[in-house]
Each structure stands twice: as C-alpha cells, then as structure tokens.
Amino acid sequence: MDIVVLGGGVVGVTSAWYLAKAGHKVTLLERRDGVALETSHANAGQISPGYAAPWAAPGIPLKAAKWLLQKHAPFTVRPTSDPFQLRWMLKMFANCTPAAYATNKGRMVRLAEYSRDCMKTLRDELALDYEGRQLGTLQLFRSQAQLDASKRDIEVLEEYGVPYQSLDASGCEGVEPALARVRGKIVGGLRLPGDETGDCFRFTKALAAEAQKLGVEFVFNCAIDEIELSLGRAVAVRAGEQRFKADAIVCALGSYATGFLRPLGIDLPVYPVKGYSLTLPMTDADAVPRSTVLDETYKVAITRFNERIRVGGMAELSGFNLALNPKRYDTLAMVVGDLFPEGGDISRAEFWTGLRPMTPDGTPLVGPSPVPGLWLNTGHGTLGWTMAAGSGQLLSDLISGSSTAISDEGLTLARYG
C-alpha cells in the first residue's frame, strides 16, 4: 500500500520504519527541516515501561491543588481561553477513581511492556548510535512517607510481573555511587532494572536513516494543509501545491493532531502538557548518575548520556505556549544541583521545552479513526519514546491486516465513544 505518515517525531518515524519493513511504500511529511525537532528533541531520555501509569490516579486532584501552592511545583495550570482545556481536565479528574486507574494502568502496561520487547528486537537488529544504556531507573524518596507510599506501587509492579528492587539509602548509593556525596538527603528508592535511557533525538535520526534504506521518503519543510476525502474515505494529503495520494494515512502529529483533525469531525481528547529540560555538559563522570534517577518529590528525572546530563520533568497545562518559563529552569537547576552538585556545568545548560500529547486517561490512541483510511498514533504523553516501538509495530500490523502480538482493546479512540 501507499502510506503517508504525518509527523516526524519519534512516534511518526517509528511508525514509518515498521510500515516500510512490512513492505509498504511510505512517505513521511514533516513541517520542520528534520526529524525529532519538537517534542522528541530534548526529552528526559528515558524508556520506562516500569513507570507506565496514568497521571489520572486516586488522590491526584488533591495533590494537584497542593502543588499549585508550591514554589517548585511539579504541576502547574495556566488557564487559557480555550474551553477544551477545562473539558480535558474534567475528563482527567473523572479518571482518578481506583477502578478507572486500574483499567488505564493495565492498558498502558500492556503496550509499554510490548514496546520494550519491540525495542530490544529493534536494537538487536540495527546498530543505532543513540548513547543508549540498559541500566534501569532509580526512583529516589526524600521522606519516609514517600518510601512507605511506594508499597502501593510495588503491589502494582508485582501484579504485572515487572522486576523491581526496593532499596534503603545505602542500597541507592550502591546503584548510584554519586549519591554518597549527598548522603542524608535520600531515605530510600525503588529501582526498575528493565528500564533504559538514551538520547531520543539521536535515536530518531538514526532510525530515520534506517527507514530511508527501506525506501521511506522524507519530505521536510512540508506544511500540511488538509486530508482529502472521497466518498467519506481519506485518500490523500494536501500540502500547498503538493498532493500525496495514499491508501492509508497515519496521523502522528502529537498535540497538534486534535486541531488538525477537528474539521473532519474527529474529536480527539489529546491536550498538550508542557515539559521542560536542561542539558548540561558533564564535568565529573564520577559525580553524575550511571543511568537515570527520578526525584519523587519534584517529579524530575536526571539522565546520563556519554558526556552530558539531561534534567527533565514538570507538567504545565498552558495550551500551545512554547515560551521558556524561568521558574521551571530554577526548579530543574535546583534539583540537579541538590543531588549531583559537582556533576555538570549549570552555567552552560541548554534550556528547552516541548508539548507532550496527553489523553485524559493516560492511554495513547493507536489504531483506526472514525474516517476509513485514516489511522491514529498519538496521545502518548510522557511515554512517547517508551511506547513508540510497540505502537509502531501494532499499528503496522493493524494496517497490514496481520495478526497482532497484543490486543488493541482499549488503545483506540473507540473507548471514548
């Protein structure tokens, strides 16, 4: 089939690679002059299936209210004039019940665990250079209350068979020796050895090069105008004077998919959740994490690359505003300076922001749309890279009419009625 993929982030490029591998003729359209230049560009650098869980969880509405009053809050809301923001938040809070959380968590873990398997197969097949490490994630607890609360997370991990290690402060230093330099700040941790790290930008560029070898055509600086319908079916994409005919179209436009598809009568429950990161040159290899650590208090991840440190996190509901908020810089700088004060040169930090495409229930949208011939692969939230390989393989199988390795139940737009 002739297939057009819209969007050159990690989800779009991964979709294109799997579709080309299945034998399809694939064209990828991207408005920027290269791949992974927006949300996939400078994320936290984690592939974390062990942390595949919806933000919509019991107790979150109360926590969110408290966070709004904190100086270094992990979550903030900047009200906009768009009524969709409020509707999306109400849908999210409606998913904060124990029953909804359990259902959504199960769907996300199913896809994330499958994606980890797909990622391993992909990594074994292709010699991709993306500064990847397979050394796990260490979640750090600064208080006994956080450590005690992790027992609920451990129960969920055991339920889904996710390997873990519950560690005291000494155990955390054994996994991440640099933490010994700030002894007394951490009371314990939860390690997920199956998680991975790396530079998502480098990964996406490397995979795009492999996709080109399979015949994928990349069209950059391409401003997509609309999807053309014939007898109710998606048959082409128009971009200026260009027309790209297609047997199938994959929308992997992240947060921008919602507005783009609205003229077709498709109501996507995907809203941008703004995240921030700092990238620092490493100054002392013994004073930084070996892999990635997640500060539970501030919801900030610190990830080691070859010669750099990536500090990422935060969640800001402010629409499509891409302005860099200096308060977020202060929080990220505070966390990395507090835990790894001698590891990087903060004076040379690169400050970045991106818009994560989030659904109210946390589960992405992977599968058919209400318009025949148009397929969705968006809404992955903070787990875009974590779920990219599994989502790409699943979508390729669905489009190809092949049997799928996992069920797509609850992963499509159909769950929203």
Swiss-Prot record:
Claim: Oxidoreductase is one of the keywords in the record: yes
SUPFAM superfamilies (alphabetical): FAD-linked reductases, C-terminal domain, FAD/NAD(P)-binding domain
Group of enzyme by EC: oxidoreductase
Entry GO terms, CC: cytoplasm; plasma membrane
InterPro entries, per database record: DadA, FAD-dep_OxRdtase, FAD/NAD-bd_sf
Descriptive protein name: D-amino acid dehydrogenase
Known pathway: Amino-acid degradation; D-alanine degradation; NH(3) and pyruvate from D-alanine: step 1/1
Taxonomic lineage from the root: Bacteria, Pseudomonadati, Pseudomonadota, Gammaproteobacteria, Aeromonadales
HAMAP family (alphabetical): DadA
